[in-house]
Amino acid sequence: MDDPRAVVHSLVRRNLGKDKTIFGQPVKAVPGRVAKSMRPEEAFRATLSDCLAQITANAATLRPQDSRDERRSVEGLHQLRVSFRRLEVALGAFGREFGQDWLEELRGRAKILAGRLAPARDLDVFVVKLLSEPPKSGVAGGLPQLRARAEAARDNAWAGVAACISGIDFERFADDVAALASSQLPLTRDQRLARTARRMLDRQVRRVKRRGKMARSREEGDLHQLRIALKKLRYTAEFFAPLYPKRAVTRYLKQLRGLQNYLGDLNDVANVRRVVGELMREKVKKDDDSAMRFAAGAMVGWYGAQVPGAVKQALKRYRNFKRVTPFWQ
């Protein structure tokens, strides 16, 4: 059977939702199709196609079947953001390796579209996960109002998601990426994929090391930059994983994903202050205000008290990760 991923971008975008047995569930990244026999340009195009397939498949899980159908797949939105981030990394990493600065414009468009999805994802995490974890003692009176405020903001954010995936910017972006993935534009003179992969992976490791040194400050922004650098390393490693022994790849990626997920959870906690601050900026009735604001402040304080210990554990995990031998070296 032919691999359908080369054409799934157009198939899903035009027909998705008509056959729920095929396209009804959120889609995680497919294993890379990069092969040792490929030239660097071919590996780039295969990676673009896979990223776009994931984008269009997950966007489709969020599109309504009719006017009465309201799609809200928390996991589908999460995987859609992941697929945009993977595509950003592919365009940035390959673009730098090939010396093709014009790919930065396409990467910027991916970043803009991903940014339009961010408010809904942040509020999903806040409502589904973060609101349910703090102790309720002493703040129960204000939590229902805080939840109602968050749910209303979440509804608005999800309306933004619907507008994004049905808008012309999304449509044109998908078409442009599909065209690039199927083009034969000369992008590099280097014909040796193994050497290209090693350079790109080493470049990501150097970025991680720089961010790791900065993260010793334990400042929120520096830890955030380390998380982003690790994410770029992980995605690049996954792109080229088929070129290397499976056992070594699996061992390395297991450590990398564990560290990245831990920093991701820490980032969610750090976002509580920002999300609550945005919710509190809206005007409310005076009789609801004090209880809700007390609950909001207690929530920020409860999560904030956990941050120092979590940061300490994150840096310990990072030190352990540094001792893991990269599978391409």
Question: Language-model segments: which ranges?
Answer:
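Cationic, histidine-enriched alpha-helical/coil surfaces that engage anionic ligands
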Residues: M1-Q329
